[in-house]
Amino acid sequence: MEIIRGAPALSTFRVQKLMEACVNAALPVRQIYAEYVHLADLSELLETNEREQLEKILTYGPAIEAHTPQGSLLFVTPRPGTISPWSSKATDIAHNCGLGKVKRLERGVAYYVESDTLTVEQQQTLKGLLHDRMVEVVLDDFAKADVLFKRTEPAPFKSVNVLAEGRRALEVANVEMGLALAEDEIDYLVENFVRLNRNPNDIELMMFAQANSEHCRHKIFNADWTIDGEAQPKSLFKMIKNTFETTPDHVLSAYKDNAAVMEGSVAGRFFPDPNGVYSYHTEPMHVLMKVETHNHPTAISPYPGAATGSGGEIRDEGATGRGSKPKAGLTGFSVSNLKIPGFVQPWEGSYGKPDRIVSALDIMTEGPLGGAAFNNEFGRPALLGYFRTYEQEVSSHNGVEVRGYHKPIMLAGGLGNIREEHVQKGEITVGAKLIVLGGPAMNIGLGGGAASSMASGQSSEDLDFASVQRENPEMERRCQEVIDRCWQLGDKNPIQFIHDVGAGGLSNAFPELVNDGGRGGIFNLRNVPSDEPGMSPLEIWCNESQERYVLSVAAEDLPLFTAICERERAPFAVVGEATQEQHLTLADSHFDNNPIDLPLEVLLGKAPKMSRNVVSAKAVSPALEQSNIDVKEAVKRILSLPTVADKTFLITIGDRTVTGLVNRDQMVGPWQVPVADCAVTAASFDTYAGEAMSMGERTPLALLDFGASARMAVAESIMNIAGADIGSFKRIKLSANWMSAAGHPGEDAGLYEAVKAVGEELCPELSLTIPVGKDSMSMKTAWQQDGANKTVTAPMSLVISAFGVVQDIRNTVTPELRSDKGETSLLLVDLGAGKNRLGGSCLAQVYGELGDIAPDLDDAALLRGFFETMQKLVAKKSVIAYHDRSDGGLFTTLVEMAFAGNTGLSIDLSALQGTDVERLFNEELGGVLQVSRADAELIAAQFAQAGVPCHMIGTLANDQRVTIKDGAREVFSETRVALRTLWSETTYRMQALRDNPACALEEFKLKQDETDLGLTVNLSFDPSEDVAAPYILKGAAPKMAILREQGVNSHVEMAAAFDRAGFESLDVHMSDILSGRISLEEFQGLVACGGFSYGDVLGAGEGWAKSILFNERARDEFSRFFERDSSFALGVCNGCQMLSNLKEIIPGSEHWPRFVRNRSERFEARFSLVEVQQSPSLFFQGMAGSRMPIAVSHGEGHAEFASAQALALAEASGTIALRFVNGNGEIATQYPQNPNGSPNGLTGICTTDGRVTLMMPHPERVFRTVANSWHPDNWGEDSPWMRMFRNARVNLG
């Protein structure tokens, strides 16, 4: 093992935060210094030149001055027996640079602590601050790190002696192995193995437990029910299926695959043909949808828990039918009270929590980062979400008790597209090769399916450790590229059948694959790729290593599939063959035995059906006491409640523009305020048809009325999607995610009531279908504290996600109030019809109460009338702005619209019934519309005709105040800025805790700046003019190399932009160049695309660059290309970072900076304002002086120069092409207008001759006007950024 020191691991503010944590923990620590230390496991000693090369590869990131460390060493490394995602990607880079002697690279952080002598307890506390015990360990000596590379002999399987010891042997195994088997399942297994006359092996029992866990089998949803002594006619699942039986319209696949599929629109899918040439293929683009939960792992270890939750859901989408394409994601979190240090709220009590789970604050600090990082790196925009905090002692169905989300909800979902011929899975032919695609087996995530089926607190902590997984999104991206190449072959797609590997690992995935395909299988255990040779058969077969798929490929198609995988560098292995007989055999060549030898029917057969005999309960809770509520104080509290408050800290960490197909993200208007009701995507680059998704959940209402909570969730999802141009209820499909504490008094009967309310009643009445969903039935946390038994039980929680096909994405209405549209009026559509019920509201929550009666959808006809009327108005563009009424009531709806439009309001409540508090804060269904004053009465009449109450409630103010009156009486008045400050303080506090606090403060102050102009546009050219048109007509299109490396994810939209400009875009993978399949001699232009090459592990773009510089063939190819006078190149984002590290082979680039970690130390996804500078860049000719917004998505975009002198030279060279500016056109120096902290706002630069241009922002994602988060009304189909690509075509003549 070689040990190689790296750069300092913590910036100044990170060290400060760590020191503060030490002070808060009363640790006598004086100083901490941290640096990366790299460990290399070698097959033989390196030569001097090889060692130097390895040291260069391991030199990356910002230039921070190292110093000689002092103090005690605490060395944090990944847990032995695991391989970190960093390790696998860094090792790939070393191999691609020709260092074959490096078996594996690993990285740790060496902390040097100067302190007084620490007690054993203090040492443990300090270690707790330095590492995540779920995925890391702390060593006191570098030499001890060799345990990371220790290889142990494989362990054999173990048998459980049922034949001799009977049922008792299985009962013991059930507890020891954490199998979560029910009594009748133990009986079933004993009976079957006695019949087979043999003992079960541990691997067979674990496989059975996973395949039959509540998590996988949904036993409660398939159970027979008796409630209050009366047998119920249907199971829960049958009631859900009733929605499909009633309205099967437009559903192509339901209840049988990894995701549901509905009919989409016809458009031109843009992808490369087998020769690599990108083009449009006009065909139906059907829409798949899926929403998953990953609650248990997120409670244990939030970052990997949420990351692998997102990853698993993305795999479900990719593994739908015979392979498909994930497109856009959504996310959701429900947690207990945050109790932000220094910002604890009056309603946040301190009830405690068990040690084995983390706090709500930890979950919301780390979990969203994990989920966002996975989506970012995979390349899926995250466009929608919800966030609720709830933890309260209330009187509900089971008397007085604490209800809340100690076991959190972590929701991950999304939509994708699938070809018509691939919607149904194919036939698995006898003799077909059964393949695992993706990463290696690792000893992690064991028993996740069974573990998440238990209430938190029933399994031992060691088993909780085992059920945490690791994420490697860059690997999943490679696998998805393989799936893409396969579906792009149409009827020649080699994939017959595909499933993702999730809970239970291969032990669940392979049996499911062959069983669904009507086959059996013979498998060879030792063919499973594994990084840990010491694993037992159970560990190899049942571990939940991520980023894996299982699939069947006909033997004759194996060479084609192999070639695709090798080009994409996606690992795969043939593990078995499909058999006619439905039997499962797993052979182990190492021990020459069969750890599994079972008929499939024993594993997946008629395990006993569950029966639930339950009693219903009625909630009795006093009415909300209104007399002590002051409107001004109520406003302050409600705007500080995380459920209502600004969610920026959850949004800007997630890429929202990748694909170039995003039409509507969360951020609205020129001030980019996160208040959008739904997300909208374009079907492709050549159409205005698209897809929309929204969410609805009103979980606290279930503490009063289960049915109301369910109806309100469905209704809220419809109210949210109503601003998109969908047309009919039948074009909307719902995913239902049900969370409940099964067995808790009253909850089972309540769950039945809720499912019945939507499955049997509401959805059929509205022609809505629920073709997909998920359940999580163990939403309770139990523990002992100071000798007392404590529990926190979640409310029955239904989260609805609505997916719709959009007719015209240009018609989407947002909450942005417009003060430039003449005289306008605000209308309140009140589906609550004046009932003003306050039970379960945010108002009740912030005063520590529950209230007595929940709001409800009393008549489905109200929702039908609203939606159908709204859709007609949206299609005719009669609505200027729209926002639904939900959490926080009418007051919140109005002020959020005011924030988005940067305007004041003048509101009159006199048309509404009830007290001030009821009118402002009730959360009945409803919405506010801004319409032209001339149309207002006509529109109000249309709603009234549809049976929906509608009231005129005011207009925009001439000043920046929100004034609310009841006739002449003033009810409330405050400045918009003061309200925005209250609303945004929660996000500021969370950002300051998690990111660079200086950046968080700058953003908070910007939100309070009344003079901020937001995004402004000033163009020096006409964007509607196609300057390339005369050249396109001349003849053959010039060839453009659309260059990607493993992990790049922005190549398709880049190809589309150059295609529109008249180029022939060709897909070129680095493996094509390294293998000699393709030469850059063939191309006039090259573009290095954005993404996460090698997952950015050795510095963003640096690993990619080094694999060129240290590979002779690649270096020659690129050197010759850049030396050619006729060639040109563009590097965007990751491509910019990569090219900036190739300075030594690019003429005229000596003055370029490197691009390193953002000042905020956070991935920044922003819609930022830039100005084009006067420069020789051929891409920006005729554009100088233009100011316009552009997509920014990067974690390492800070331009770092070697010295102040180097920066001055770059400025003097006249090659700076692009700068961040503010709305006045001044250079942006403050965050987030300068999102990465680059000096002088620098974000684009070129060579001295202008042939090679680098830029961090993404023009290819916004070349269509509809792909811009905000744009002036007068822009046509092409945004101004299209000019860049056309300039490149003009340059070639």
Curated annotation (Swiss-Prot):
SMART domains recorded for this chain? GATase_5
NCBIfam families, alphabetized = FGAM_synt, PRK05297.1
Record flagged with keyword Nucleotide-binding: yes
**Of which family is this protein a member?**
In the N-terminal section; belongs to the FGAMS family.
- Binding-site list for Mg(2+): D677, E716, N720, D884
Pfam families given for it? AIRS_C (PF02769), FGAR-AT_linker (PF18072), FGAR-AT_N (PF18076), FGAR-AT_PurM_N-like (PF22689), GATase_5 (PF13507)
Q: Where is this region: Disordered?
A: 305-327
Listed pathway(s): Purine metabolism; IMP biosynthesis via de novo pathway; 5-amino-1-(5-phospho-D-ribosyl)imidazole from N(2)-formyl-N(1)-(5-phospho-D-ribosyl)glycinamide: step 1/2
Q: Name one GO biological process term.
A: 'de novo' IMP biosynthetic process
Name of protein:
Phosphoribosylformylglycinamidine synthase
Residues at the active site: C1133, H1258, E1260
> Which reaction(s) does the protein catalyse, per the Swiss-Prot or TrEMBL entry?
N(2)-formyl-N(1)-(5-phospho-beta-D-ribosyl)glycinamide + L-glutamine + ATP + H2O = 2-formamido-N(1)-(5-O-phospho-beta-D-ribosyl)acetamidine + L-glutamate + ADP + phosphate + H(+)
> Glutamine amidotransferase type-1 domain: from which residue to which, for each copy?
1040-1293
